Amino acid sequence: TTLLKPFSNPFRPTLASIMAPEQSHPTIAAGDHKGYMEYALEQARHSPPAPTKFCVGAVLVDADKNEILSTGWSLELPDNNPADPGKTHAEQCCFIKVAQKHNLQEERLCEVLPKNTVLYTTMEPCNKRLSGNKPCVDRILRLKDYIKTVYIGIKEPENFIDQSVLVIGRKRLVDAGVEVTFIEGMEDRILEVSMAGH
C-alpha cells in the first residue's frame, strides 16, 4: 500500500507560520484615516495578482486604544484554513487572526473584539461571493455592536458583481448602524493595486 500525503503548496504559508510571530505594526496617529488606509494598501500589495480576484488589504483597529488588532489581504490564509479554504478575503483574514489569537472560532469573535473597533479596507466589503462563501458584509453585520465604522478606499469595480448588489451591501451596513466612510484622494493608487493581474 502507498500512503498518500496531503497536498501542500510550497508557495502558500501554513496557518502555523502565519500565526506564529506577532506582527509588528507602524505607529499611526489616532484619527489618521489616510495613514491607516495607506497601511491597508500596503497589505493589498501582498495579495497574489490574478484575473479572477481583486488585491485587497484591510486593517482592524481598536479605536479607543489606537491599536492595530490585525491586518489581512486577499488569499492571505492558506488552502488548509478550515474557516474558508483558499478563498479568504482581506476583512475575513483580519477577523480570523484576532479569533485565533484568542483560540476562538471566527463566529465567537464578539467575545474578544473591543467595543469601538474600526475596519479599514481598500475596497468596499463584498455583499455577494461567487464562491457561495459568507460575504464580508454579513461578517461585519454579525459584529455590528463592535465594528462601528468601516473606512473604504474604493467601490468594487463591476468586474464580477453588479454595482446594484454592492450598493445594497453599503446600505445594509448603514441601516444596521455601521458608519461607512470613503477615504478620498487615494482612489487611483488603490485601483492600480486592486486590479493587478487583470
Residue ranges of predicted features:
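Zinc-dependent deaminase catalytic domain
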Residues: 3-198
